[in-house]
């Protein structure tokens, strides 16, 4: 190979590597690997503190957690209230947002970090969350949301910058994908801290890390900037993936998100089964607890998707 060609190829490979590194700096491991760990690996909290101590009533923990005996890393841990259905604290919504994005985004472009629902003994959680109570009858276990704690991100007043959107194609792509998700789930809480942006100088990724005020229960006194489309153009390939989402797939993927069976006073995770009560989001029968979106939620989501695609077809939202 000629020296000049070798130098050019080396530069190209270095450029690709730099792009991949920048893309992965916020979530440096494969998302599906982290997701499996959050969802299934034995875990122990080694340290934890309230995530936002100045925020009145905040119950979210910034926790250092060891999975399967490995060195601990940081996760967001939020306990459910008894019944798992409370204002701004519906764990099924957090998992639904994470799962929904999989229908139109690749893992490298996820806008919701890896998220899972777990049961843990009350005695282990009370060390860090004294007010915690059992979530469901028959066990002292507490349902918690575990979410990967993003690296190299920052909190700013608004992650959407129209000037940057017009000038930075990669940033525009990420913002457009974020806005698709928030519009579909009707995200109703634009409180500072719910949306984060990478510290990267060019093409920064953006994330929605709190999706508990959404779907039907989306009323909030902290702003609803993201409940509708804020941008006027979207990535064409992402829109084409949206077109392939069917009502049947939404029901199949979101109707039953998580399920546990009561055995010996503990809740054990099991593969999602047949929907026990499509009209309800939290279901229980014969020692089984099941969480998912209600049929009404999914039908509403389908209508949101149809409205978004109509905006594109009518030329109100362009593609690039």
Whereabouts are the PLM-identified features?
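Bacterial N-terminal signal peptides that target proteins for export
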Residues: 1-9
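Cleavable N-terminal signal peptides
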Residues: 9-10, 20
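Phosphate/dinucleotide-binding and metal-coordinating scaffold of catalytic cores
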Residues: 22-320
